[in-house]
């Protein structure tokens, strides 16, 4: 949206494909996992699916579960059409020798993994390719896992070695014709180099190109909820003319940054992956002077749960753009300590601009991941501020569902989804100030009434659990989520935590003469079931007794929306026109009205997944307004009070879900 400080406001929707240059590298790729101890993050050249199910442990890669579709993709190297051949090999073995008798599955390679958007990130998360490896039956295979090899394979010998020292799997291209190419898979004794068996087949040339991955793929839930390690891998090597190197695709150890600049203070949050305990826990921030000299301006400890380092620097004496870099010295696998830099630019406050451009986002699902159309087109507009109004992640994001407990696994599960957000928007975030605020799905809720931070009483029925009000997840986990998304915002107006010690972040920020109030319209909101009659049969915030109730029956004088603390903040904010403020804008998760419509026969939103998607310009027949109390049209009394305060500042409202 474009915000003109002269007169009116023009709202435009900015939805944003990018290609990266490659280096045709003749050197072989060789994995290096010889780190001391354990580390969840595999390294800057890899993406693991999912993050919490893999680790480096004493010099090798391990899959920590016996479950379906676990993989580690190489993101800096690809197989491409321009070459003619490649070879690839890895050592592989069973972590648990009893796996052969208990599980059906396989381990090995994925060749030519591709998604639907022709992007290496999409390939790494959703790509499908040619499987090639060894099954728990002892058969080698390429492509069709259900077919048994006809070659004379000594299956017992293969499985015995897999259970002991492991074997070396080697795949290479063979003969080729115009349309097809031969793939040959061989198994070797890892110690002696003796060839144990081989299997070959012909594959369409076009499907060999794409990402390369290691994979452990077993029947789901063999061990129920028990996490049982399955396979280890080591010495992954690839070479050949089809192999191309993209060094700029490295992801980490600084994954991405977010920053704000307001009233002479800049705050920058750097996001890190789950590094091992033996890695350094401090990062520093440097600014570049006019003489291109870098000066250290802050050093911070990486928070052990959110894996963030947040820097705060007074920049009131630096009115222009400020080149910055986050500096981290660490120990990559197989190397001495190295120093990595992640650079960006803190933009000058655009107070001299007549028009301020704001790109606003909400509901960042992964249907179009990595959203290259969105990011490229947004950058064409060169916005002055990015605003993410909630649901930066959804529970199913990236596949594999979501983890509610234990807290350590739930944390890594969330971080993987959050890293995907940074993978999408990182190039914008490093150079453009941004606001992010958390909504329900960010904290693993379908709907949320924060009720001042109370603990929601657990219930097997998710709707009942949410209707109780408060947070389902532990407070330390909620605080972790908020640190990842909001710690770069200006300091909160009143930092006192709410119930359970859950932190707050509501604040104000000045950009280009516009004062933005950033509020939390979910954290204090009362759950309707706590204050409304049982006769309304409230389920997940919907009165299911009737399609439409008298609005007066649904209102409650007791129910809160923003709470006393945020109302006091807004009363202060609307009266404060300091710091060259000439316009005001409010940022919230949800609009202060109930505008959703549903068919007149529906009593809740459970029908939504079954509704027909209308064409542009077409409106559904028989739709009428809803009484969804997850929206901020409810509670009406508290909503009206909030609007009365906000209108005193003539504030333009930027909000997310309807809800």
Identify the residue ranges that each predicted region occupies:
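Bacterial Sec-dependent signal peptides at the C-terminal "C-region" and cleavage site
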Residues: 3, 15-28
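Extracellular carbohydrate-recognition regions
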Residues: 24-50
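Short carbohydrate-recognition loop motifs
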Residues: 52-70
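Secretory/extracellular carbohydrate-interaction modules
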Residues: 65-148
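Carbohydrate-binding surfaces in secreted/extracellular proteins
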Residues: 88-90, 160-201
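Metal-dependent phosphoester/phosphodiester hydrolase catalytic core
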Residues: 103, 107, 174-179, 186-188, ...
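Short, aromatic/His-centered strand-loop micro-motif at the edge of beta-sheets
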Residues: 143-170
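Flexible glycan-contacting loops in extracellular carbohydrate-active proteins
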Residues: 194-231
């Amino acid at each position: 949206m474009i915000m003109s400080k002269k007169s009116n406001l023009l709202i435009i929707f900015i939805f944003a494909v990018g290609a990266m240059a490659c280096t045709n590298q003749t050197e072989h790729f060789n994995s290096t996992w010889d780190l001391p101890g354990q580390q969840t993050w595999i390294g800057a050249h890899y993406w693991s699916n999912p993050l919490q199910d893999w680790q480096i442990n004493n010099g090798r890669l391990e899959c920590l579960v016996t479950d379906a579709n676990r993989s580690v993709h190489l993101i800096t190297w690809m197989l491409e059409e321009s070459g003619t051949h490649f070879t690839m090999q890895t050592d592989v073995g069973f972590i648990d020798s009893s796996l052969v008798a208990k599980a059906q599955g396989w381990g090995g390679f994925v060749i030519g993994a591709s998604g639907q958007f022709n992007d290496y990130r999409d390939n790494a998360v959703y790509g499908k390719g040619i499987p090639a490896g060894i099954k728990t039956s002892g058969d080698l295979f390429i492509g069709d896992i259900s077919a048994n090899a006809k070659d004379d394979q000594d299956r017992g010998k293969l499985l015995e070695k897999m259970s002991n020292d492991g074997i070396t799997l080697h795949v290479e291209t063979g003969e080729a014709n115009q349309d097809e190419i031969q793939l040959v898979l061989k198994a070797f004794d890892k110690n002696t180099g003796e060839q144990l068996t081989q299997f070959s087949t012909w594959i369409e040339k076009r499907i060999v190109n794409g990402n390369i991955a290691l994979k452990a793929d077993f029947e789901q839930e063999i061990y129920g909820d028990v996490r049982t390690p399955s396979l280890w891998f080591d010495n992954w090597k690839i070479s050949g003319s089809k192999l191309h190197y993209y060094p700029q695709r490295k992801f980490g150890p600084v994954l991405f940054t977010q920053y704000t600049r307001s009233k002479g203070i800049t705050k920058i949050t750097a996001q890190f992956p789950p590094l091992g305990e033996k890695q350094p826990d401090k990062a520093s921030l440097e600014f570049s002077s006019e003489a291109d000299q870098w000066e250290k301006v802050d050093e911070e400890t990486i928070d052990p749960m959110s894996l963030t380092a947040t820097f705060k620097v007074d920049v009131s004496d630096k009115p222009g753009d400020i080149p910055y870099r986050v500096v981290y010295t660490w120990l990559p696998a197989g190397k001495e300590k190295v120093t990595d830099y992640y650079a960006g630019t803190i933009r000058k406050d655009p107070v001299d601009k007549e028009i301020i451009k704001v790109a606003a986002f909400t509901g960042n699902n992964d249907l179009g991941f990595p959203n290259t159309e969105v990011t490229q087109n947004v950058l064409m507009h060169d916005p002055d501020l990015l605003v993410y109004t909630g649901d930066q992640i959804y529970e199913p994001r990236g596949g594999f569902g979501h983890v509610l407990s234990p807290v350590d696994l739930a944390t890594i599960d969330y971080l993987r989804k959050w890293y995907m957000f940074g993978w999408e928007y990182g190039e914008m975030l490093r150079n453009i100030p941004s606001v992010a605020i958390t909504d329900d799905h960010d904290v693993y809720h379908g709907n949320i009434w924060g009720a001042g931070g109370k603990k929601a009483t657990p219930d097997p029925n998710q709707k009942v659990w949410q209707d109780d009000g408060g947070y389902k997840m532990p407070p330390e986990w909620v605080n972790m989520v908020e640190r990842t998304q909001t710690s770069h915002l200006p300091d909160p107006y009143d930092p006192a935590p709410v119930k359970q010690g859950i932190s707050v972040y509501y604040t104000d920020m000045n950009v280009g003469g516009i004062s933005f109030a950033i509020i939390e319209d979910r954290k204090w909101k009362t759950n309707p079931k706590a204050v409304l009659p049982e006769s309304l049969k409230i389920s997940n915030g919907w009165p299911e007794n009737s399609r439409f109730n008298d609005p007066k029956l649904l209102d409650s004088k007791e129910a809160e929306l923003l709470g006393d603390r945020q109302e006091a903040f807004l009363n202060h904010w609307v009266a404060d026109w300091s710091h060259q403020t000439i316009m005001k804008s409010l940022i919230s998760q949800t609009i202060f009205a109930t505008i959703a419509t549903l068919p007149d026969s529906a009593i809740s939103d459970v029908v939504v997944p079954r509704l027909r998607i209308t064409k542009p310009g077409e409106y559904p027949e028989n739709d009428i307004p809803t009484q969804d109390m997850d929206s901020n049209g409810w509670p009406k009394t508290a909503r009206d009070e909030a609007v009365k305060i906000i209108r005193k500042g003539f504030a333009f409202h930027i909000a997310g879900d309807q809800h």
